[in-house]
UniProtKB/Swiss-Prot annotation:
GO biological process: amino acid biosynthetic process; aromatic amino acid family biosynthetic process; chorismate biosynthetic process
A Pfam family assignment: EPSP_synthase
Residues binding phosphoenolpyruvate, per UniProt: K22, G96, R124, Q172, R345, R387, K412
SUPFAM superfamilies per UniProt: EPT/RTPC-like (SSF55205)
Descriptive protein name: 3-phosphoshikimate 1-carboxyvinyltransferase
Reactions this protein catalyses: 3-phosphoshikimate + phosphoenolpyruvate = 5-O-(1-carboxyvinyl)-3-phosphoshikimate + phosphate
Source organism of this protein record: Vibrio cholerae serotype O1 (strain ATCC 39315 / El Tor Inaba N16961)
């Protein structure tokens, strides 16, 4: 297996322009495909998850032109749901942002589809979404394990009416249903059961739907009403924001070993909840400065925090490795959905933090981290999880090297992460 050893870094400083957001890129691609008119998407993320969505759209009859650097894409919208005459199998890798929304969208039109992916995708739950789609008349069957992909979908349209969705495992189930609801056969009301996790990701979905001309009435995240008679219309141009989760590594690095780092492509008006990571970093003692399209972080004396991170679970992973440089014991709470991500992130994070010398308590939905007096050089397993690789790069900000196994797993969202990290390192 390939590995990368990062030597101790004395100082982090400079400027980094973020790649496009994965969450925004795949949502916008799907809505551009369903919309009437041509949409020119700029700052699109070039990564595995986006490639899986683009490949699926090609098979579904969507025409698009991708620039040589793959960050600008002109999508010719269908102006309707997908209609295919031949059975199709769509392989979606480990891309939840493709699997969940496409599973819902393919119920809208006519066609016979199998949705599948990598072995890990077959361990990532989709039952709550399928249950909701079946309430609206969808014909979906599980081909292997109940509640998990692969799925077989017979497109027959989605009925109007009221459905309930369990929001406690993943917000992607609600996102998927919301994006398909305007093309259902009438008014749709979605009622949420349980605590809705990762609410800021729902805000991203609603914001992008609005840019494509669709209104959703949001009753305090407990009920969503999608009025009948709406359709998606291209906004013409669509700029994909920088990925706020990806910003977290550079902001944390500056907080630990700055200098100062300026991250461009996101700012105080970002639609992504993960920019709240900077607030958590500020609570730990970092100095943060906001602009319209940038965030600056500077070093501070870091102290432990005890916080609920249910709203920003992805960026919370970066707090776990930042905690190695903070005084005291840090607790990251209410992050059960780490367990159903690219890997079981609670178990993986606990295992790898212990390797570098931390004392760790792993609970069902929390992790408590006490740093050692000196970090240990360890080979970090990344579990084919891009965020594990990027989080543990921060260990090199100590006086100890760190070895990252399978560093190329960052290709899921940030293929040149380690190059960008090196450019800021002194």
């Amino acid at each position: 297996m390939e590995s990368l050893t990062l030597q101790p870094i004395e100082l982090i400083s400079g400027e980094v322009n973020l790649p496009g957001s994965k969450s925004v890129s795949n949502r916008a691609l799907l809505l551009a495909a369903l919309a009437s008119g041509t949409t020119r998407l700029t700052n699109l993320l070039d990564s595995d998850d986006i490639r899986h969505m683009l490949n699926a759209l090609t098979k579904l009859g969507v025409n698009y032109r991708l620039s040589a650097d793959k960050t600008t894409c002109e999508v010719e919208g269908l102006g309707q749901a997908f209609h295919t005459t031949q059975p199709l199998e769509l392989f979606l890798g480990n891309a939840g942002t493709a699997m969940r929304p496409l599973a819902a969208a393919l119920c809208l039109g006519q066609g016979d589809y199998v949705l599948t992916g990598e072995p890990r995708m077959k361990e990532r739950p989709i039952g709550h979404l399928v249950d909701a789609l079946r309430q609206a008349g969808a014909q979906i069957e599980y081909l292997e394990q109940e509640n998990f992909p692969p799925l077989r979908i017979q497109g027959t349209g989605l009925q109007a009416g009221t459905v309930t969705i369990d929001g406690s495992i993943s917000s992607q189930f609600l996102t998927a249903f919301l994006m398909s609801a305007p093309l259902a056969q009438g008014k749709v009301t979605i009622k949420i059961v349980g605590e809705l996790v990762s609410k800021p990701y729902i805000d991203i979905t609603l914001h992008i739907m609005e840019q494509f001309g669709v209104q959703v009435i949001n009753h305090d995240y407990q009920e969503f009403v999608i009025p009948a008679g709406q359709s998606y219309v291209s906004p013409g141009q669509f700029l994909v924001e920088g990925d706020a989760s990806s910003a977290s590594y550079f902001l944390a690095a500056a907080a630990i070993k700055g200098g100062e780092v300026k991250v461009t492509g996101i700012g105080k008006n970002s639609i992504q909840g993960d920019i709240q990571f900077a607030d958590a970093l500020e609570k730990m003692g970092a100095q943060i400065e906001w602009g319209d399209d940038y965030v600056i972080a500077r070093r501070g004396e870091l102290n432990a925090v005890d916080l609920d991170f249910n709203h920003i679970p992805d960026a919370a992973m970066t707090i776990a490795t930042t905690a190695l440089f903070a005084k005291g014991t840090t607790a990251i709470r209410n992050v059960y959905n780490w367990r159903v991500k690219e890997t079981d992130r609670l178990a993986a994070m606990a295992t790898e933090l212990r390797k570098v010398g931390a004392t760790v308590e792993e609970g069902e939905d929390f992790i408590v981290i006490t740093p050692p007096t000196k970090l240990i050089h360890a080979a970090i397993d990344t579990y084919d999880d891009h965020r594990m690789a990027m989080c543990f790069s921060l260990v090199a900000l100590s006086d100890t090297p760190v070895t990252i196994n399978d560093p190329k797993c960052t290709s899921k969202t940030f293929p040149d992460y380690f190059d960008k990290f090196a450019q800021l390192s002194r």
